[in-house]
Amino acid sequence: MLSEREVISTLNMLRNEHLDVRTVTLGVSLFDCVSHDLELFTANVQAKIRRYASQLVSVCDEVGDKYGIPVVNKRISVSPIAVVAAPFGPDGMVRVCKALDEAAKEAGVDFLGGFSALVEKGFANGDRALIEALPEALAQTDRICSSINVASSRSGINMDAVALMGRQILRVAEATADRGGIGCAKLVVFANIPQDVPFMAGAYLGVGEPDVVINVGVSGPGVVKKALDRAREAGRNEKGAPLTLLDMAEVIKRTAYKVTRVGEMIGTEVATRLGIPFGVADLSLAPTPAVGDSVGEIFQSLGLSSIGAPGTTAVLAMLNDAVKKGGAFASSSVGGLSGAFIPVSEDSSIEAAATAGLLSIEKLEAMTSVCSVGLDMIAIPGDTPAATISGIIADEMAIGMINHKTTAVRLIPVPGKGVGEEVSFGGLLGKAAIMPVPGGNAEDFITLGGRIPAPIHSLKN
């Protein structure tokens, strides 16, 4: 039972701490749009998106105004295009991507995800065509996001796909060189990708999902930080004893509970008004570049001088676990990624730590072993070899595969820039100093190709 004080603290979140719902994402299945005729297929796709998404933005705004809780992003996810557009080659995939971009703009949404392929065990024709089309497709569209799943705990790691994605990431960067390689900010490589992610760039609608569905991404890193700051100022827990990390975990858990209840309430009302089923609430703490809306600042509230200091991985493990516990108690419909995001360019505190040399790619990789997602929004030198990018991807995929968790890589090679120089992507994507990549050469390892087998599911040590 929530006390009067906790009810008041929830009201304070709304009035003074900028609590928001980070995204309401409409999932639309495109399997009933399939055709061997490209023109008919794209017409079917646009018609179906128009039918279900035309009121999405206005309804989200109405519900947000009703409760005083803004819905920051309105998005769409669709069935994996490599599957539903399998008959078409790379040129056809580019045309499909442009048609999706037009549909997203017509609906008024921020992004549309699902230009995706699932290749953890091998390539189908549609997968190869989509991956080949990525540079042109992402360069010629504004709102399309792509995700490629190259590994899973049951299938292992498709190293041929890892090698290919290392090359394609560089090609996407070159195709968008005039914008700092921003195409790579809309491309993410996954292990164990969930089917119901509302967050970009990994959102797509899985084959086991409903025909249409509303998924919501809650947020609130700033709210969590302020709750921790209040607890630290008080210095004692509810029983009057000195504050410990156990008490701080309880503060995070209770805050996550309240944030999740708010997010689910918004999502279910939007779904009801649209006449669409509600799917899941993704519990992820998702930062923005704004000061006060940072995951990195939470580490300072828990006693570290900065994210990246010794103890960072332990704090992240505690934070991630407490968020999940609080969110799972608040909702029976938890899904997506549900953890803490650590995107370098999108979080002012993380970006500052990386610029100061307190965070390396190696440290970020260690952190991903205890949190959701992975190496996210990291700017690297534009002349980074493809094999190095593939090696970084392989390392991150191995963490996900062995630990039965989702991990991902979103690296941005910035053409013409080197370590220490800055790149700005604008808006929620933020800015970042270019980070050095690990030394050494992975070329011979990557060219071996094939598949790293799935791990044994007993003998856990």
UniProtKB/Swiss-Prot annotation:
CDD domains: RNR_PFL_like_DUF711. The lineage of its organism: Bacteria, Pseudomonadati, Thermodesulfobacteriota, Desulfovibrionia, Desulfovibrionales. InterPro entries: UPF0210. This is UPF0210 protein Ddes_0622. Disulfide bonds: none annotated. Homodimer. It comes from the Bacteria. NCBIfam families: PRK05313.1 (NF003700). Pfam families: DUF711. It comes from Desulfovibrio desulfuricans (strain ATCC 27774 / DSM 6949 / MB). Belongs to the UPF0210 family.
